[in-house]
Design a protein with these regions (language model features):
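Start-transfer (signal-anchor) and selected internal transmembrane alpha helices
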Residues: 1-46, 130, 137-140, 216-223
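Perimembrane helix-loop-helix junctions
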Residues: 13-14, 202-229
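Membrane-lumen/periplasm interface segments of specific transmembrane helices
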Residues: 59, 217-309
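Short hydrophobic/aromatic helix or loop-helix immediately within or flanking a transmembrane segment
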Residues: 62-70, 82-106
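Juxtamembrane segments of multi-pass membrane glycosylation machinery
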Residues: 92-113, 272-283
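Transmembrane-helix motifs of polytopic, lipid-linked glycan transferases
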Residues: 108-133, 173
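Multi-pass, polyprenyl lipid-linked donor-dependent membrane glycosyltransferases
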Residues: 113-117, 142-173, 192-204
Length: 313
């Protein structure tokens, strides 16, 4: 007769054998890609289904109008925004995405490609956990599950179309490749990051600070300088030239000064106010919302939050 104790032992042994198989190099390579594929399918189906009931935000409409204008050979000036779509965030990654819409239906293409960007982030996240943080399969699985079920991830998938989503896997992959000293590959991923949104140059600069803290001073300084330079050139030269002559988000920085260069001078002359804005209550609550589901995991180190801090001001 099988007792409860015997059944429990059999269950434990079966679980241990399963975990041992997952710890094998082959399973470690395949598992994150399988998870990413499943997550992509789920997110894509949810986003497309949401679009059918007209439940998506206006951001999708902005980019669909821009696509139509670009196909017609006209400047993509979105009527509701009153400016060129690229003047908003200098999201030049939208150009190659637009090429796909010439082959596939525009709405579904934008949503499916966005879902892919969200899902594929699982792979570098897994690799960071396994290689950089030396976590076991169980801990990495918990991180992956926390990411997949995170409210911010689900809301982003169902909130229209946002080119900056493509920066998420690229930023994680850039950090991972930096740990392996593959700097040309890092450069490719960072190009994806900054072409997704101009102010993500600040996130690249913060990633450079992370590299500096990890004894990669020379490369870290270079990455930080490139990220900061990209943001400044895009925000104060390219975006005003494409748009209405000034940085389109100046109202958010009105407390620092008037005009693009007035804001820049105000931020440089009073860095403590900038730091205060980054760590004010609302920004701090954003950080807690982002990391709360994974605070118990050993992967989390406070310096890894630095790439997102510039975006909270």
């Amino acid at each position: 007769v099988t007792t409860v104790h015997t059944a429990r032992r059999r269950y434990d042994m079966a679980l241990l054998r399963f975990q041992a198989r997952l710890e094998s190099p082959k399973a470690d390579r395949i598992f994150p890609w399988a998870v990413a594929l499943c997550l992509w399918l789920v997110l894509a189906v949810l986003a497309v289904a949401r679009s059918k009931d007209l439940g998506l935000s206006s951001t999708l409409g902005f980019h669909l109008q821009a696509l139509h204008l670009m196909e017609s050979g006209v400047s993509p000036d979105v009527s509701e925004l009153g400016t060129n779509i690229f003047a908003q965030h200098a999201a030049f990654i939208f150009f190659p995405i637009a090429l796909l819409t010439k082959i596939f239906p525009p709405t579904e293409t934008l949503l499916v490609v966005q879902a892919f960007a969200i899902a594929i982030a699982v792979v570098p996240l897994w690799r960071i956990g396994r290689e950089s943080a030396n976590l076991r399969i169980g801990a990495c699985s918990a991180i992956t599950l926390a990411y997949a079920l995170h409210p911010s991830v689900q809301n982003l998938n169902l909130a229209g179309f946002h080119p900056e989503v493509f920066a998420l896997p690229a930023l994680l992959a850039a950090y991972l490749q930096g740990q392996k000293e593959r700097w040309w590959t890092v450069a490719v991923f960072l190009l994806i990051v900054v072409s997704s949104r101009s102010d993500l140059g600040l996130a690249v600069a913060a990633l450079g600070v992370v590299f500096i803290l990890e004894d990669k001073q020379r490369k870290g300084v270079l990455v930080a300088a490139i990220g900061l330079s990209w943001f400044l050139v895009m925000a104060f030269v390219v975006q005003p030239a494409i748009g209405n002559g000034e940085y389109p988000h100046l109202k958010s920085f009105a407390s620092y000064g008037a005009g693009s260069f007035g804001v820049l001078f105000g931020m440089i002359s009073d860095p403590f106010s900038v730091l205060g804005d980054l760590f004010e209550r609302e920004s701090f609550e954003k950080v807690l919302l982002l990391v709360a589901p994974v605070l118990f995991l050993p992967l989390v180190r406070m310096r890894y939050l630095s790439p997102v801090l510039p975006l909270l001001g």
